[in-house]
Amino acid sequence: MDTKLLDILACPLCKGPLKLAEDKSELICKADGLAFPVRDGIPVMLESEARTLDVDERLDK
């Protein structure tokens, strides 16, 4: 994913920052505890497509 795009993207719910997961398959919002999928390099920023982070993922810095 293009780093310039990542700089301007925000969580669609809280408008907070997103972090690209290490495997680059998800954008993580720590504030809401959600992971938005990245499919074929395109972020899917729909709440209905996001998964809830588990406790370990929420605590991971």
Swiss-Prot record:
Cysteine pairs forming cystine bridges in this chain are none
Source superkingdom: Bacteria
Q: Record's GO cellular component, any one?
A: cytosol
Any coiled-coil regions, as ranges: none
What the entry lists under InterPro entries is as follows:
Trm112-like
HAMAP family tied to this protein: UPF0434
Please give the family membership noted in the entry.
Belongs to the UPF0434 family.
UniProt name for this protein? UPF0434 protein PST_2635
Q: Which organism is it from?
A: Stutzerimonas stutzeri (strain A1501) (Pseudomonas stutzeri)
**Lineage of this protein's species?**
Bacteria, Pseudomonadati, Pseudomonadota, Gammaproteobacteria, Pseudomonadales
